[in-house]
């Protein structure tokens, strides 16, 4: 698989490409599948439809990897927190984590209750072309913790940070508990058939450097180290969003570092490029315009060359992006990097 070879810095015939949120609302096929499911959460839980949605971007766009269709919040959901998705607003937990008692009341073994995810993986792997990789994923302990404490996405993360500074032991207990679940969750995804795993630290940028390293990065390192120990041949991709200013402190046993669009790629290459493969980092809104798209691709390929790079966006696909431009992006990257 070209994608897997690229994760390990091996020579590839061209630069592989996939896109974060490549299965999404910009595809009418996705909209139809979601309609059949009835809701976003039911779509995640319906393995037949989730498989359909996982495969759509590979079939329509020609990307080099499929990423499992699911949601990072299924883990806290199966730990006992009721979750709903509010239209035009997003995820919302009906109860929150406020103290040590509420952390202790979380159910352990959530990874044993996520069979609908593993079924989607095995179905997808059976149907996916052998030369295409399947990526599994989870959210980082810190990002999951913020949702569990705030009840939803936040602009200030005030409750999470209040706990971090005034009751750090409570937050560490929660992060430890989540890390243990995530190690087993990703292990079972690998056993079900994924070829690589990715950890999304979507709210990494909520923390100053010292707090980030202690309350997020240390846990990411712990998870990736254990996974590499268990499954050395499975690439681990980490995507901490918005930590461009902290790159000099990034270390650990993983293979690919996801670069968001706000971080200069030249800088990431200079600091991390010798040690890790870089993934990213096209600004997603360039997909609205073909000229802007071409210019962005040219710039990235000039910096990265043919090795040590997986092409991706620096954030997820937006719901109203023209699908023909997404398809054009895949062709553009393949054609420009063939050698």
Swiss-Prot record:
The keyword Cytoplasm applies. GO terms for cellular component: cytosol. It is an enzyme of class 4 (lyase). The record marks 71 as: Transition state stabilizer. Its main location: cytoplasm. Catalyzes the decarboxylation of four acetate groups of uroporphyrinogen-III to yield coproporphyrinogen-III. Homodimer. This is Uroporphyrinogen decarboxylase. The gene is hemE.
